[in-house]
Amino acid sequence: MRTYPLRRFLLALVALSAFSCLSLAAKERWIEQRDPQFGYNYSYPEALFASVADDGKPGFHYLAANASDAKFLVGAWDNRDGATPEHFKRWMIENAGGYEEITYQPRGRSWFVLSGYRGDQIYYEKVMFSCGERVVNILAIAYPVAERDQFDPVVERMEDRFSTGEC
């Protein structure tokens, strides 16, 4: 049987690197928040993000990374136009701009994700409809491609903990 010590070493190095990034995300102190108006829940690592001035829209929260060009937005609004998840996704792609390089777009009955590249940034946007599609909730984050190893596990955890409020 032929062995490949260099291949094993590289495989072990990749596994160790991935584990280190995941454990860093797990060790950080996470802030858990609930929006008072719409009741959605979100979380973020305290060491990575800090609140920044917002535009005064109720139900929205803006954060920026302390030592990076990463940005994080979470918000919700009343779906007065009665948009469906598919209609709103189509509207975002056709009107909001920056969706030329979509690499990931899973969807469910009441939610969808758009993720991809905008220049040197990776974006991840999850939209969830709640309360019989009366409320639209969004989590959006963008971060430098060069910092993917640091942010990918963080985004995974943020996405897992993002939830809609009760109706």
Enumerate the predicted regions with their spans:
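Bacterial N-terminal signal peptides that target proteins for export
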Residues: 2-11
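N-terminal "mature-domain start" segment
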Residues: 26-56
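Short, solvent-exposed mixed-charge patches
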Residues: 165-167
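Bacterial N-terminal signal peptides
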Residues: 11-20
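Solvent-exposed, polar/charged alpha-helical surfaces in well-ordered, non-transmembrane soluble domains
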Residues: 42, 46, 86, 90, ...
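Conserved polar/disulfide-associated segments of primarily extracytoplasmic proteins
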Residues: 53-153
